[in-house]
A protein has these predicted regions:
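Membrane-interfacial helix termini and adjacent extracytoplasmic/periplasmic loops
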Residues: 2-7, 43-51, 56, 91-92, ...
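Transmembrane-helix boundary motif in ABC transporter permease subunits
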Residues: 2-8, 67-99, 112, 116, ...
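Periplasmic/extracellular loop-to-transmembrane helix junction in inner-membrane transport proteins
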Residues: 4-9, 13, 36-71, 86-89, ...
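Interhelical loop and adjacent transmembrane-helix boundary motif
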Residues: 7-12, 46, 53, 211-265
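C-terminal transmembrane helix and the adjacent membrane-cytosol boundary/short C-terminal tail
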Residues: 7-10, 14-18, 26-29, 33, ...
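Transmembrane alpha-helices
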Residues: 17-22, 101, 148-150, 154-166, ...
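Hydrophobic alpha-helical transmembrane segments of multipass integral membrane proteins
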Residues: 25, 60, 64-76, 80, ...
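Transmembrane alpha-helices and adjacent helix-loop boundaries
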Residues: 104-111
């Protein structure tokens, strides 16, 4: 009879109990409080709250800007990860460290810096202003801020895959006469796709909930540049907790659905790469 190895961490029951306790304190209880506060509203009041013109406009602004930022992050993040892994150049370590700057930098500081940079008197903003393009206090500015906070998720998700990627397949394809574009789309990209989806999914969730860095550059004009987190904050300042939690619950549900869909896509891609059924 084969002897089973004892687990390094003693006591499965104790470990599971601690895990569930931490998960409950950090995730489940705060989420349950949203449901409890929202339950104070009738279904009719709930629908009226989340379908107010100002709220719907904030949903549109948040989701459209977040989606645009995620698409750009997916492209730019993959390129950055590729450059950091495949090439050696002066300042590579500095650039690699700067990727994580949005994680360490206070969001308010990031917002002020981005606003100063993209305003009409800023270095970047004044350049685009010459072409009649305004960045700060527009949806373009919101998208820029979301790109800033979201791009590390894509880079850090793609980097490990590139570092561990077996180059023999792409080299074999090159020997057989395949073009570089064909090698990338047919050999390299399928292996990167799960990591890109993972990074963009996390970035999308971060962009939707971002407040500090966006609120400074947005201009907060109702029905145009007002993001949903700001509407929630306004409701809280008016002590309307039920309305605030109702709006937050919608954001939570949509974010959870997108992350769940992203996870399903990753699992499907992983099965395809392992040679399983799609």
């Amino acid at each position: 009879m084969k002897k089973r190895n004892k687990p390094v961490i003693p006591g499965f029951g104790l470990s599971m109990g601690i895990t569930i306790s931490i998960l409950s304190l950090v995730v489940l209880i705060p989420l349950a409080s949203l449901v409890v506060y929202t339950a104070k509203l009738s279904f009719k009041d709930f629908i009226e709250t989340i379908t107010r013109a100002r709220v719907l406009a904030s949903f549109y602004t948040s989701f459209v800007c977040a989606f645009a930022a995620v698409v750009i992050n997916g492209i730019m993040g993959t390129i950055l990860a590729w450059v950091l892994v495949k090439y050696d150049f002066p300042g590579k370590r500095l650039m690699d460290g700067m990727i994580e700057l949005p994680f360490a930098l206070p969001t308010a500081v990031a917002g002020i810096a981005l606003t100063s940079l993209t305003s009409d008197s800023g270095i970047v903003g004044s350049f685009f202003a010459g072409f009649g393009i305004k960045i700060a206090y527009t949806r373009i500015g919101i998208t820029v801020a979301m790109i800033f906070v979201g791009i590390p998720f894509v880079v850090r998700s793609v980097q490990p895959v590139l570092e561990k990627m077996d180059n023999s397949y792409s080299e074999a394809a090159g020997v057989l006469g395949a073009k570089k574009t064909t090698i990338f789309w047919k050999v390299i990209f399928p292996e990167l796709k799960p990591a890109i989806f993972a990074g963009t999914g996390l970035a999308f969730g971060r962009c939707l909930g971002e407040y500090g860095s966006v609120v400074f550059i947005a201009g907060n004009k109702p029905y145009y540049t007002e993001i949903t987190p700001l509407v929630i904050m306004s409701e809280l300042q008016e002590f309307d907790y039920s309305s605030a939690t109702a709006i937050a619950l919608v954001m939570l549900a949509v974010s959870f659905f997108i992350l769940f869909l992203n996870s399903m896509i990753q699992q499907r891609n992983a099965r395809i790469l392992r040679g399983g059924n799609a």
